[in-house]
Amino acid sequence: MVLKSLSDLRNIVAGGPRKKLILATAQDQHSLGAVVRAWKDGIIEPILIGDKESIQNICNENNYEISGVRIIHEPDIEMAVEMSVKLINNKEGDVLMKGKVGTSTLLKCVLNKEWGLRTGNLLSHFALFEVDTYPKVIAVTDVAMNIAPNLKDKIAIINNSVNCLRRLGYNMPKVAVLGAVEMVNENMEATLHAALLSKMNQRDQIKNCIIDGPLAFDNAVSLESARHKGIRSEVAGDTDLLLMPDIEVGNVLYKSLVFFAKAKVASVILGAMVPIVLTSRSDSEQAKYDSILLSAAASK
């Protein structure tokens, strides 16, 4: 199975048990709108933590009906985030979502050594894009968490992403390790990492996927381009997951797809005790809703 559009996420989670989603500092309009919609659709059972009066005012102004939804009043932002994380640490939630709070504040609590959501795995960002010019949904990692991942980090990032894709129904996801060129160049670290990751996959050191690289972006997403360059690959032109060389390339690609290609996107942080919806402030309510669906599908 592969996803043809982000709407397929709804089919994956529909009819299953509701996931308990905790919205940290819930006094944010777009986040509340997405959460209420997912609740009405039977996907989640939300707990809203934050300033109760602000939450209710936003809901009243936007006609969000939340009667029956649990609200925990905590006006202090840092305390609200801490309470949210502790609830999940105590097995009272399946998904954590960022509301009106800075990313650094949320991650500080997530990574707390005493009551945070550490598992020993690397945290990584995973995004799904629906682009009109590509025949299926394509995943991209890591565009927001790991600045300059080394080889060990990239192995962990691939494993996080492949595990998520398999929960979405993929059997053997095809992973393209991106570089500026498709030839190994000793002066370009990304190509060296790509070659090593490909060989490790061939030797079954990285499992449950097919990895090829280095591949330039055009080879990864266009079979015609790959054939023109004489590249023989199971991955080229049929990529399910693009592994970025670093955060700068990843972040530029992410925003280029959204703003230039008008791509639809859903994203999640993987590697913690539960999936974390950590969308950008510029993301639309629809993107937040799709990210909730993705996180619900990724939740164990």
Which residue ranges define each predicted feature?
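Anion-binding alpha/beta catalytic cores of soluble intermediary-metabolism enzymes, centered on
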Residues: 1-48, 52-235, 240-244, 249-300
